[in-house]
Amino acid sequence: MVHESDVCIIGGGISAAMLAQKLSELKPGLAITVVEAGSRIFDSENRHTYRARSLAFGENAWPGDFIEDQAGAGIISRTMAVGGSALHWGGVTNRFSEEDLTLKSRYGLGVDWPIAWTDLERHYCEAERRLGVSGEPGPFPEDARSEPYPMAPMPLSYNLKVLKEWAEKSGILFNGTPQAKNTRPYDGRATCLRCNTCEICPTGARYSPDYTFKALLAAKTLTLHDRTLVRRLVRSADGKRIEAATGVDRARNGEAVEYRAKTFVVASGYAWTPHLLLLSGVANSSGLVGRYMNGHAFIGAQIELDAKIYPGMNEQHSLISRKYFRCRQDVPFVRHDLRVWESSAGREARLKDAAGTLLLGDAVLQDWRARTARGAARVRAYYDVHPSIDSALTLDASRKNAWGDPMPSIRHVWDEASIARRAATREHILGVFGQLARANDGRVFNVSEGNYLDHPAGGCRMGTDPKTSVCDSYGRTHDHENLFVVGSTSLPTAGCTNGTLTFVAVTLRSATRIVSSLI
């Protein structure tokens, strides 16, 4: 079966939702088709039940959000459904900083982005409006905004108020972490009730792409084909254009399908976008498809503090400091965010004390009260590392899906400069944790380090030179005039904080160029 449209978007996650919404506004009547390998899970009315069963029995709150044999090795999300990973994201919407776009020119590290900060900042504001972000202006002048947040910040719980006062005794300024959660009715969705299960929001207060897709379908501004796996992009005879996308309809026993469009946009995330390009042998004259896979490293710890808190009140909300987003050029490079959450570490009820003595009856409560006289905070820093060209997604012939396609394998490799400064970065971050503790008669314990990169991105990095990048700043591939890639895959570096708002902003910036390319 052959389907025709003006724009064919491959992938149905948050980038696809934002792009489809903006395209439909920029050019009403545009024929837009969204093709998603997973299923549409449009059952928000059941999420109270899913949440309850998850809490009671530990059940998966998102049954059916994956494809059994569509998986790879490395840090690869298994989620495949209309809405993508943002069906169950935490909703954190931090911005990057200007330093992220000018790493090479400022510090001689990594690579500069081909986007000006003022341009990106404008699209940050647009992304915050579309997602519905609640937040407050930060205390640092470098983080000045051209527009206020759409909504007032999430209220700080008693615990976070105590922790903010505690943390700022160190001289480090904090504010509430911005989030795509409603603090008032917004865009037809309810106010956050602080249910503390953001991964399965029962009220719709936390933004989720399925709400956008449902609205677009109701307005008849797009066609959505779910359970349809695109397997190849087909080049024109001269190789300058993509003339078709071919795949299988999983709802019809693997029946062959073909999509023809004026413009194709691959919005399948950091893993599946380069995977499709590699399978198809397209957009890779630079040899960099699947290369420069990135993310950020992290160090976390618990800190005992001389304050009493009562864990359990909106534990997912946190404080953030952007103090260390900036690094002077005359000192060793280190950039990181700094987050603080309430914690019950070491303060849970127990039936044996530290000596192994059995505790029963009143002894359990006495022990518990004694150990909660001093509270605890969880702290974590995402820090900036940069990828080597060998940080790559490759095709693994030993792992194939039902249609014989090799699955992806991701191996993250830091560049030499990131490896060389790792020990100094660790020392600096632990020093910051120590500063927080010392200012409050506390102690640091349970230090942990990830052995992987969080919030992964890359694989189709943007740039101005076709020899050193896959696409331009709008996501148009250098090799094919009607093929765009959007989302986290185009980010040259992953910053030192959550990247969702950034790649949504970059995607929204691409929408205008995609529409103009159709004229």
Regions found by a protein language model. Give the residues of each.
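Conserved redox-cofactor binding core of oxidoreductases
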Residues: R106-G108, D112-V230, Y452
